[in-house]
Amino acid sequence: MAESILDRTINRFWYNLGEDCLSESQFDLMIRLMEESLSGDQIIDLTSLPSDNLQVEQVMTTTEDSISEESEFLLAIGETSEDESDSGEEPEFEQVRMDRTGGTEIPKEEDGEPSRYNERKRKTTEDRYFPTQPKTIPRQKQTSMGMLNIDCQTNRRTLIDDWAAEIGLIVKTNREDYLNPETILLLMEHKTSGIAKELIRNTRWNRTTGDIIEQVIDRMYTMFLGLNYSDNKVAEKIDEQEKAKIRMTKLQLCDICYLEEFTCDYEKNMYKTELADFPGYINQYLSKIPIIGEKALTRFRHEANGTSIYSLGFERKICKEELSKIRDLSKNEKKLKKFNKKCCSIEEASAEYGCKKTSTKKYHKKRYKKKYKAYKPYKKKKKFRSGKYFKPKEKKGSKQKYCPKGKKDCRCWICNIEGHYANECPNRQSSEKAHILQQAEKVGLQPIEAPYEGVQEVFILEYKEEEEETSTEESDDESSTSEDSDSD
């Protein structure tokens, strides 16, 4: 009966461990239980505990040894804890120590403090809804080392170079395993993925002559980088050197704060050229640096010797030293500005009299700045006035009529004759209208030069027209009567 209880308890332990349902106290309790109950023939592999799903492969061989009373007591505690866990609440366990000789140690009450063994901890909301989980090793993201995948990558050349270096190292350190080109191709095929793997698999390689690794790398350069390394490798390298020289010539440094970025770009292109040309490119590099370039070039010519002539790092070191000097000088200048000259009592007598004009400090009037208001002042909206921005009408009388022909074509309103105005009319003194015109001029009125104005003129005009009509009618009647008489 005891053996069946032990097996059942251990099986439940492994089942709960796989589902992350055990608390720390339950985990420690079951480990101690297995240590006490298992004999030397029983083996449990606990090395694979921090796996992905916390599933443990164990090899157990049960024996027919009797279980001690202490283990039965612990099993009873475990069964009660399982019943509580089935009810939906997390059980609370107290840490119980177990002696090898037998018997359990129950924590004793200290002076003034209740026993933790008998005291129940009050559950909080966090403990009920978010039960604590056993501490485990976090899952580590496994990355495939040495795998080449250049699908949709921008730095393809860097990836190919790193992969080729690793493949070459594997082949050279294990020459006995990679004597056959087939094995090398198999290794390269398993170390690639994507389009690179398809290239190695579908290409017919020359396995008799040449280095198979170099063939694969040259073909990758041709297919993925557009460099014709397979057919004309020398011409491609010469073309790269020419592009690097043009790039170094075009590089400029306008701000000394970008010295590191400028040096990195220049150095990357310089190492694509021949080693014998390095001193000339270093002098060109120093001539492009502002502020400290001349001093650094002078120091480089005096201090460089041997292999340091070909070293751009040596020149970078000199530039950093010159920059540190300028930085220290600027710090000292800032300190001198804060230095109070009045505190220094040791002064030499001036040897110049009247050489320097004393100048007073210019007074700058501080402009008044309106205080900021948090609220917007309310202004009453003014009533709309039409014609506010237009020129007002003149109150004087109308101006004289403009005669565009340059001569007086207007008709005089006194004598109704064209050729002169009313103020120049010779009949104005003898006529009553002339007296009216004189009185109007005294008041400030001017005559209107439009003809046929006034009641009298219109009447006269109509009267004259009627007289003319009657005369024409009489003439017509006379002509008609004469014709009738002739016909008779």
From Swiss-Prot:
Listed Acidic residues bias regions: 80-93, 464-488
Single Gene Ontology BP annotation: viral penetration into host nucleus
InterPro entries: Caulimo_coat, Znf_CCHC, Znf_CCHC_sf
Localization annotation: Virion; Host nucleus
Keyword Nucleotidyltransferase: no
First and last residues of each zinc finger (CCHC-type): 410-427
Main location: virion
Motif (Nuclear localization signal): 120-123
Domain of life of the organism encoding this protein: Viruses
General function of this protein: Self assembles to form an icosahedral capsid, about 50 nm in diameter, nm, composed of 420 subunits of the viral capsid protein. The capsid encapsulates the genomic dsDNA. Following virus entry into host cell, provides nuclear import of the viral genome. Virus particles do not enter the nucleus, but dock at the nuclear membrane through the interaction with host importins.
Record protein name field: Capsid protein
